[in-house]
């Protein structure tokens, strides 16, 4: 993603893609320009602490709820050690299943250091958040009724399906997304490019 700001203890610190200073006006101007920012802890896990800031039609948004400029700036000051980046949307054909960004888990092996091999992968789609893309795309299945949706992914052609709802103490087969009711089967449109990216990361 593009990196805009790091929330330091004295205010936002501009990062490589910011074209503004780390001031109130600079931060708010960037938000107005790009429209959406993902906000997440600089060193976190399990999507804990994920938030979304937005600006649309002359209105500021915090987690898709209307706010004013003062509220947005207060939010920034109250979230030190967070990083503000480009906000991703689901794509590659997966947006028809759920608008919330998905996760592709990939394992590569590279025994020769020059020829990485895709060894295993699966897709994980967010559940329990409806269509609200400001919510974390993963909730650990530690409470009753909380699950993640995992899909088998064919490494050769990017086709996916054979869904499993993974709860803390059991697994349920599911061909439909539990929030949207849409069938969880298809093919990632840009699979060759996805594999090329994974290969590049493995060679880095």
Mark where each language-model region is.
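Amphipathic coiled-coil/heptad-repeat helices and related helical stalk/stem segments
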Residues: 23-24, 68, 194
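Amphipathic alpha-helical segments that form well-ordered structural scaffolds
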Residues: 1, 83, 197-201
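A conserved helix-loop-beta module that forms one wall/lid of the active-site cleft
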Residues: 1-61
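ATP-dependent carboxylate activation and anion-phosphoryl transfer catalytic cores
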Residues: 96, 101, 111-118, 170-204
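A generic structural signal for short coil/turn motifs at secondary-structure boundaries
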Residues: 13-15, 93-95, 185
């Amino acid at each position: 993603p593009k990196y805009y700001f790091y929330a330091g203890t004295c205010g936002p610190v501009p990062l490589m893609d910011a074209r503004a200073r780390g001031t109130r006006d600079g931060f708010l101007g960037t938000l107005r320009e790009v429209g959406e920012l993902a906000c997440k802890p600089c060193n976190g896990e399990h999507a804990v602490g994920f938030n979304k800031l937005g600006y649309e039609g002359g209105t500021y948004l915090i987690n898709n709820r209307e706010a004013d400029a003062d509220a947005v700036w207060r939010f920034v000051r109250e979230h030190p050690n967070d990083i503000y980046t480009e906000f991703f949307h689901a794509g590659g054909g997966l947006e028809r299943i759920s608008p919330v960004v998905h996760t592709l888990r990939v394992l590569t092996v590279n025994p020769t250091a020059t020829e990485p091999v895709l060894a295993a992968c699966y897709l994980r789609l967010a559940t329990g958040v409806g269509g609200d893309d400001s919510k974390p795309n993963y909730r650990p299945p530690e409470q009753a009724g909380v699950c993640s949706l995992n899909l088998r992914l064919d490494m050769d052609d990017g086709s996916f399906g054979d869904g499993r709802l993974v709860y803390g103490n059991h697994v349920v087969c599911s061909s439909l997304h539990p929030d949207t009711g849409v069938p969880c089967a298809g093919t990632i449109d840009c699979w060759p490019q996805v594999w090329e990216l994974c290969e590049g990361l493995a060679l880095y």
